[in-house]
Amino acid sequence: MKKTDFRVMNNQDVELEFDGKAIAFIKSRKADHKIHAMAEEMIKMALDIGIELTDVIVDGGANEDIDRGSITDFCQTLDKTGAVVVFVDNIFSFTTEPDDLFKFIDTLMNRPVLLVDMEHNHTWA
């Protein structure tokens, strides 16, 4: 899949029933209660579409490189759970480097998973 092949949809276009599990990725250095609030919002959205959010990976570091421990943990969790939906607080939580981000999204889309950006209300399928 090439960069231009991604479909960006608003959440109104997303199929509301899924068969499988979901995981979440949050990059934040905010207080724990704020991180828990973000996770609760993701859990609620998962339940609303009839899917169980099993794991939330939190990256509290300042590093934005794609080759960091929290991304490795995320990928291992995705493999382990076989999740079909990935919630992320902001798509740029994975990395702010455009080429790395496109490659990473491309890797996710080859699984396939539905990627949900909570901050920008976008999904990628």
Residue ranges and their predicted role:
Residues M1-A125:
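Short, structured surface patches at the beginning of a domain
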